[in-house]
């Protein structure tokens, strides 16, 4: 198996491991947090493996410029791997893009419902989630046209539930739409990875099960106090996680964080994510942050094994988190809120 894998994918695996080794280390983050201006941030970044990514930039230093250039580098690395891949890795790489597409669609649906400028929103879309039909949003004037333009004849059409009410799409909370799409995405990606077998199946089903549980718990917590009935909540919970169906059914009925934690403790120990949460100073560490920390550890551990596609998935996840961290630090510097500058998500690469 290892010989077959190396013949087809050995170069891309080695390349991706090299990309990962070039990510920011603890000392790099320390240098960034000591910057006094966005100009300093850009100079510091160019002293890392990013190199002269701002070399051709004519705009004044801003968080938007920094984020765009960082995303462009992620885009270059992704498409280099994608363009040199063969099946089944090509399809696997497409699955990595789908969450970005879903987020872009959710952004545009929310914009349409709130009468925002579509041209401006299109510029805010993540480049990894762009697809040809996305431009059709600009001319959509109602939910029916939006549904036809984006949710039918597009790469993410396969994730649209049959019972999603098209006629009330304009009035649905965009997070509900996103949750339905993500559930279908995770379940189909899980099934695809399981079919691949070998180390890829072992690594990816573990990562996707965690992602499914994270989404379930987050949705359950966010639904507390809402008017979403248990039956509708349950429809948004992915079923490919470690949490069994009885846990999902139970959490769909709960309106108390402590009870959700108790259910998590009984089945998989996720309850520790809630420990001392209310005592974190100034809300610096949220439930989402704790899940991101756990996700970062899991994705770093993916590189301890060989001969599997999981490293491509984990690299994109880690790189996405790195961009998020740099943008957070840049925002704190731009807004002179340096007391919060260290509240980024540590990536244990050292």
Curated annotation (Swiss-Prot):
What cellular component terms from Gene Ontology apply here? early endosome; plasma membrane proton-transporting V-type ATPase complex; proton-transporting V-type ATPase complex; proton-transporting V-type ATPase, V0 domain; vacuolar proton-transporting V-type ATPase complex
**Alphabetical list of InterPro entries matching this protein:** ATPase_csu/dsu_sf, ATPase_V0-cplx_csu/dsu, ATPase_V0-cplx_dsu, V-type_ATPase_csu/dsu, V-type_ATPase_csu/dsu_dom_3
Q: Which GO terms describe its molecular function?
A: proton-transporting ATPase activity, rotational mechanism
Q: Which domain of life is it from?
A: Eukaryota
Q: Does the keyword Transmembrane helix apply?
A: no
Q: Name one GO biological process term.
A: proton transmembrane transport
Q: Does the keyword Transport apply?
A: yes
Keyword annotations for this protein? Hydrogen ion transport, Ion transport, Transport
Show the Gene3D superfamilies listed in the entry. Answer: ATP synthase (C/AC39) subunit, domain 3, V-type ATP synthase subunit C domain
Please describe what this protein does. Answer: Subunit of the V0 complex of vacuolar(H+)-ATPase (V-ATPase), a multisubunit enzyme composed of a peripheral complex (V1) that hydrolyzes ATP and a membrane integral complex (V0) that translocates protons. V-ATPase is responsible for acidifying and maintaining the pH of intracellular compartments and in some cell types, is targeted to the plasma membrane, where it is responsible for acidifying the extracellular environment. May play a role in coupling of proton transport and ATP hydrolysis.
Q: How does it assemble?
A: V-ATPase is a heteromultimeric enzyme made up of two complexes: the ATP-hydrolytic V1 complex and the proton translocation V0 complex. The V1 complex consists of three catalytic AB heterodimers that form a heterohexamer, three peripheral stalks each consisting of EG heterodimers, one central rotor including subunits D and F, and the regulatory subunits C and H. The proton translocation complex V0 consists of the proton transport subunit a, a ring of proteolipid subunits c9c'', rotary subunit d, subunits e and f, and the accessory subunits VhaAC45 and ATP6AP2.
For this chain, the family text in UniProt reads: Belongs to the V-ATPase V0D/AC39 subunit family.
Q: What is this protein called?
A: Probable V-type proton ATPase subunit d 2
The organism of origin for this protein? Drosophila melanogaster (Fruit fly)
Annotated gene: VhaAC39-2
């Amino acid at each position: 198996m290892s010989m077959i894998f190396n013949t087809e994918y050995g170069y891309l695996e080695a390349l991706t491991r090299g990309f990962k080794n070039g990510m920011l280390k603890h000392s790099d983050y320390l240098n960034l947090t000591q910057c006094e201006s966005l100009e300093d941030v850009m100079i510091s970044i160019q002293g890392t493996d990013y190199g002269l990514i701002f070399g051709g930039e004519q705009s004044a230093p801003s968080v938007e410029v920094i984020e765009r250039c960082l995303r462009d580098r992620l885009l270059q690395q992704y498409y280099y791997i994608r363009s040199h891949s063969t099946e089944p890795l090509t399809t696997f790489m497409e699955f990595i893009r789908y969450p970005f597409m879903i987020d872009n669609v959710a952004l545009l649906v929310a914009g349409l419902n709130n009468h925002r400028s579509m041209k401006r929103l299109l510029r805010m879309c993540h480049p990894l989630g762009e697809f040809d039909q996305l431009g059709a949003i600009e001319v959509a004037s109602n939910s029916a046209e939006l549904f036809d333009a984006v949710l039918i004849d597009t790469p993410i059409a396969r994730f649209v539930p049959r019972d999603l009410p098209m006629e009330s799409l304009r009035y649905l909370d965009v997070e509900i739409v996103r949750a339905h799409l993500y559930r279908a995405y995770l379940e189909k990606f899980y099934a695809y990875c399981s079919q691949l077998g070998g180390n890829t199946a072992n690594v990816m089903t573990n990562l996707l099960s965690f992602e499914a549980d994270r989404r379930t718990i987050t949705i359950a917590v966010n639904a507390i106090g809402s008017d979403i009935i248990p039956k509708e909540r349950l429809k948004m919970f992915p079923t490919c996680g470690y949490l069994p169906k009885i846990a999902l059914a139970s959490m769909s009925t709960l309106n108390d964080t402590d009870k959700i934690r108790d259910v998590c403790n009984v089945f998989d120990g996720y309850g520790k994510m809630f420990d001392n949460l209310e005592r974190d100073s100034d809300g610096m560490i949220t439930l989402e942050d704790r899940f991101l920390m756990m996700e970062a550890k899991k994705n770093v551990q993916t590189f301890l094994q060989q001969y599997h596609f999981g490293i491509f998935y984990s690299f994109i996840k880690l790189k996405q988190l790195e961009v998020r961290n740099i943008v957070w630090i840049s925002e704190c510097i731009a807004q002179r809120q340096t007391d919060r500058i260290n509240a980024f998500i540590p990536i244990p690469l050292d």
